[in-house]
C-alpha cells in the first residue's frame, strides 16, 4: 500500500485528497506557490514545501520541482488532482521513470484519450458511438470544407489537444469554417503546442451527460452512473446532478456499458469520466471525450453510490483490485452540486479576488461543502475562481432542489462577490425545476433578471 502521497495541486481538491489519505493512514506532502503560503491545504498536510513563484507555470506546472520534492520527502506516490498536470502524459511518464506511483492511468492511456482525434478513432474501433466527423486531424481547409459540405452545417472545429472548453469553434457557413480552422490552429499551437484540429457535426439541441468509471490494473472496470452537466456558461460547468433527469433506465444502462467499453479499450486504470453528447430528442448518445482524472463534480456520484472515489483511486494505484463489482454498485436518491466561484454574476461573472471577511458554510442532514476557504483567507487572482462546492443529497430531485435552496441561503461569504445569488435564482427558475433544458439554457434565459 502507498505510504506517503505528494499532492501536486491546490485548493479544495488538495484538501479533499489530504482528508482521504489521512483516513487511510497515509502521510501527506503539500506543495504550494508563493501566493499560496497561507492556503488551507498547506496547513492541514503533514509536510508542506514551496515549489515556486505565484504563476502556475513556475510552480504547479514545475515538474522538476515537484518530482525533486517527492524524492526529497520520500513520497512513493503523487496525486495530481484535476487541472495542472493531471492529464499530462509526459508527467505520468516522468513519475514512472523516477519510480514514483502516479495516482491515475498509464501515460499510454492518457495519450490515447488526451489526443482527441486518436480518442475518437479508438472509440470508433471499440464500437462506441461517435459524432459524425473527420477521421483524425484534417490536413487543410479544403478537406474541412469538403467534409462540412458532406455532413451539412453547422459543424464544430476542435483542437485535438484542447480541453476545458478551450480550442472549440462553431462554423455555420463555409466562410466561418475557413476562418475558424485557421484561427483555431493558431490558438491551439500557442496554447497547447499542437496545431492539429478536427471537425465534427455540431449537434445543437443536446444535454451534456458523463459517466463515471473506475478500473484497476487487473482488467476490471465498472461504471458508477451518470452526471448531468448540462447547465454551462461559456462551456464551463456550473451545476451538476445525478441521476440525469433526461435519461431512462435503458439508455442509462447502454451509456454505462459504452463507458466501460471505452475504459477497457485503452487499458484504463483509476478514476475516469467518459463524456457524452446526449441527443434527447432522438434518444441517441455520442462519445465526446474522456477525462483521465478525477472530476470537479465527483462528489455527487459519491453521495448517491456511497463510494469514496479518491480512496478508491489510491487503493487501485497501490495495486489493489477494485473493492466492488458492477453488481455491488447501487444508486440511492438524488444529488446536486453548485460550484461557488469568486465571480460577480451581476457584472457578467467578472472575477472577484480579495480577502474573505466572513465565511460561514451551511450544514445539516445531506449537506456537504468541499472548500479550501476560511475567514481571513485572501483569494489569489492567479488561479481558478472556484472557492467552494456545495453538494446536497436527498431522496428525490424536488427534495434535493429544496435542500440546495436552503443551504445556499445559509451560506455566508463576505468580502468578495460570489455566484451564490446566481445559483439561488437558477434553482427557482421554472425551466430548471422542470428538468427539461439543454446546454443553451443560460443563453436562452437571463437567470439573474428573471
Describe the residue ranges of each PLM region.
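ATP-binding N-terminal substructure of ATP-dependent carboxylate-amine bond-forming enzymes
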Residues: 1-126, 138-146
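ATP-dependent carboxylate activation and anion-phosphoryl transfer catalytic cores
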Residues: 2, 7-24, 48, 71-73, ...
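Short secondary-structure boundary/hinge segments and terminal tails
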Residues: 38-39, 87-88, 113, 140-142, ...
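A generic structural signal for short coil/turn motifs at secondary-structure boundaries
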Residues: 57-58, 110, 167, 298-300
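Conserved beta3 strand of the protein kinase N-lobe
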Residues: 133-134
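Acidic/histidine-enriched active-site and ligand-binding environments that engage anionic O-linkages
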Residues: 147-156
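N-terminal nucleotide-binding beta1-loop-alpha1 segment
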Residues: 159
